[in-house]
Amino acid sequence: MSADGLAAFLAEANEFRTIPIVRKFVADVIEPLGVFANLREEAVFLLESKDDESPWARYSFIGVAPFLTLESETGETFSVKDENGNEQITAPTLKEAFQWVERTLAVKPLAETVPFTGGAVGFLGYDFISAIEKVPRHKNRDVPMKTAYFVFCESLFAFDQKKRELLVIHYIRLSGNETEEEKIEAYRAAERRMADLAAKAARPQAEQPLLPAESESGRTASFAKAVSNYDKKQFLRDVEAVKRYIAAGDVFQAVLSQRFCVPVQAGGFAIYRLLRYINPSPYMFYFQLDGVEIVGSSPEKLIQVHRRRVEIDPIAGTRRRGRSPEEDERLADELYHDPKERAEHYMLVDLARNDIGRVAKYGTVEVPVLLQIGKFSHVMHLISKVVGELDDNVHPIDALLAAFPAGTVSGAPKVRAMQILQELEPTARGLYAGAIAYIGFDGNIDSCIAIRTAVVKDGYAYVQAGAGIVADSVPELEWKETRNKASALMNAIEQAERLFAKGERAVC
């Protein structure tokens, strides 16, 4: 036990009720997936950046031992519960519930270079929109899960891939009534806990079966056992219905989606291992919480807040990566000059400017990057960057909600497009097209759109994907686009079943 560390802790305990202690390690022989596998009995989330080609790939986080949850069934009220499920407070909004946690915990600020050092981690389902906009609630919610669910963890593992550093952050929680001896014992217990976690993290990975190198990113998903929530003929008719709304001037675009249900025996973690190998992405995540596993590989940021600077990076327009540098350059040039891709992208940039403008100081909204080719491991996109500075009276959560949901998964204008989608789509979207996010005690937020995402629950995996319908859309091609967008996840599921599943399969 460090005497200096203990003295600092005792001084901080006079001012704060929740105090982080930090240990740094060189992360040269461990990596996030292996550490999570070793800590799976207590760990609830793994957030990774796995695309070396992406400018956003640097940090990964693991959360261990949640002590509070912030959750909502419908988005209309939020409950904060302790680790035993006892409700502590009910609040009308996400922001008010989070602010109650901030006040109650009274967390000592932590000056570290990693962007997230503790706070809430979880998801907002797409259906949350009905609580904040004039969008009717869908009548058919056939996959029961919370609309919002966030956890606050006692311990956090933060990896910096660039520096090859690991920070282990452990929060000591006090009531404010402890004697000095009790505070000293709390510090000693935290030291023992961190030593135990570090030892578990460094264990060999003997209990995890090796992933065969034959797992193929190029394999085509068969969809053989998948059942769609959409009859194909009805989907094609609904594409035409959206086009009629466009012709009438209601919207410019709406993103119509279909959901695939697949019976699974392989667990969500096996699917995640395949997915990160097949389709690495800037935003990869695995959650095991509230009876649900969530597996995702999202390419697209929803919104980021860092030191009150807000950023949205609109993505629209896609080409595969070339098989040679020359083909790669040709495809990039083709994408950049495609008039349809550019028109859609400009529309999304305007949406992002509007979203940030709702919460930013007047005159601070800028577009420092416009129509840049962003290259990822398997594809390239047109990418722009829209930034602004949060207004003084705006909470970072206000920025998250201003951008929710993304225009790329709803349409334009957003609210009218979502009203049309609620009318046409046969089932509620659930998590799909919502957000995966962390909300830091320090006000930092990072979030991605919940696309390329599977929900694994009660022996089934649910995968949903959409296509942006515009005036000249061809229904058959839009149907194929939804399947193409779901194919990476379906491929991961099918390979996980082939490699790891045992026993009889259910039927959707």
UniProtKB/Swiss-Prot annotation:
It is an enzyme of class 4 (lyase). It catalyses: chorismate + L-glutamine = anthranilate + pyruvate + L-glutamate + H(+). Keywords: Amino-acid biosynthesis, Aromatic amino acid biosynthesis, Lyase, Magnesium, Metal-binding, Tryptophan biosynthesis. Its cofactor is Mg(2+). The keyword Magnesium applies. Feedback inhibited by tryptophan. Its EC number is 4.1.3.27. InterPro entries: ADC_synthase, Anth_synth_I-like, Anth_synth_I_N, Anth_synth_I_PabB, Chorismate_C. Pathway: Amino-acid biosynthesis; L-tryptophan biosynthesis; L-tryptophan from chorismate: step 1/5. The keyword Repeat does not apply. L-tryptophan binds at residues 49, 282-284. GO terms for molecular function: anthranilate synthase activity; metal ion binding. Binds 1 Mg(2+) ion per subunit. Transmembrane segments: none annotated. Chorismate binds at residues 317-318, 432, 452, 466-468. One of its GO terms (biological process) is L-tryptophan biosynthetic process. Part of a heterotetrameric complex that catalyzes the two-step biosynthesis of anthranilate, an intermediate in the biosynthesis of L-tryptophan. In the first step, the glutamine-binding beta subunit (TrpG) of anthranilate synthase (AS) provides the glutamine amidotransferase activity which generates ammonia as a substrate that, along with chorismate, is used in the second step, catalyzed by the large alpha subunit of AS (TrpE) to produce anthranilate. In the absence of TrpG, TrpE can synthesize anthranilate directly from chorismate and high concentrations of ammonia. Heterotetramer consisting of two non-identical subunits: a beta subunit (TrpG) and a large alpha subunit (TrpE). This is Anthranilate synthase component 1. It comes from Bacillus caldotenax. The gene is trpE.
